[in-house]
Design a protein with these regions (language model features):
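Generic structural signal of hydrophobic/aromatic residues within well-ordered alpha-helices
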Residues: 20-27, 140, 209
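Active-site nucleophile loop of the alpha/beta-hydrolase fold
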Residues: 5-17, 25, 31-32
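Short aromatic-enriched loop/helix-cap "lid" or pocket-rim segments at secondary-structure transitions
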Residues: 16-20, 90-91
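Serine-hydrolase catalytic core
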Residues: 45-190, 194-214
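A structural motif
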Residues: 24-39, 45-50
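Short, proline-centered helix/strand-breaking motifs
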Residues: 9-11, 22, 50, 75
Length: 216
């Protein structure tokens, strides 16, 4: 292995409840059962969550945290979104800045401000794109082209229902011109937001990844 590509890595998350997962798994098989999930599930969107999957994720997180406590000297490219609703990206960037010691290591950061780092090179790209009605990026969006048939522009029918909202038709019937996109689905600032599932900077990101792989 000559290096790492990390897209929205999640050894750190924005909740303190993760530590309770191993204990809770002794009493519950599902965090959200298929019956509770209701509508909104598609081939490209999960709404059920078994506890065994969460336990496996927590175990992976623990190993990743241990690894980040040690210096890593091969090049690493990390992709993070400032407003990720799940991943604690500020903490992840801080850990990367301290542990990824290769001078070729870098982070592509989607956000409103360029974070300060000691060593890590940061390529900052804006996540607030007014003309495209985009306020912030989700961890899912960084991986997909706007042309992707399932996650790209025009694929809102797969994702138009914000989590836990009982009115899926309401969101699906809103004209495209009135929809905004962000790290999660919600209503605020007078706008209806649905989760952004594609990356408007996908071509630029691809260029950066290819340059990294070529040793530049």
């Amino acid at each position: 292995m000559e290096g790492l590509l990390l897209f929205s890595p999640a050894p750190y998350v924005r909740t303190n409840l993760v530590g309770l997962v191993p204990f809770a798994s002794l009493f519950f098989e599902w965090l959200r059962t298929p019956e509770e999930a209701g509508g909104g599930t598609t081939a490209f969107r999960y709404r059920t969550l078994p506890m065994t999957g969460l336990v496996a994720y927590c175990d992976t997180m623990d190993h990743a945290e241990e690894a980040l406590e040690k210096p890593y000297r091969k090049p690493v490219l990390t992709v993070l979104s400032e407003f990720d609703s799940i991943v604690d990206t500020e903490r992840m960037l801080e850990a990367a800045d301290e542990s990824f010691l290769n001078p070729r290591s870098r982070t592509i950061w989607y956000g409103d401000e360029t974070p300060e780092t000691k060593v890590m090179k940061v390529i900052s790209l804006p996540s607030h794109l007014e003309k495209e009605h985009i306020r912030s990026f989700s961890h899912l969006s960084v991986n997909f082209s706007p042309e992707n048939p399932h996650y790209g522009r025009g694929a809102r029918a797969e994702w138009c229902r914000p989590e836990n909202d009982p009115r899926p038709r309401f969101y699906c019937e809103i004209p495209e011109s009135e929809i905004w996109y962000g790290a999660w689905g919600e209503e605020r600032d007078g706008h209806v937001y649905v989760r952004l599932t594609y990356n408007p900077h996908f071509e630029r990101q691809t260029e950066e990844v290819l340059a990294f792989l070529r040793g530049k």
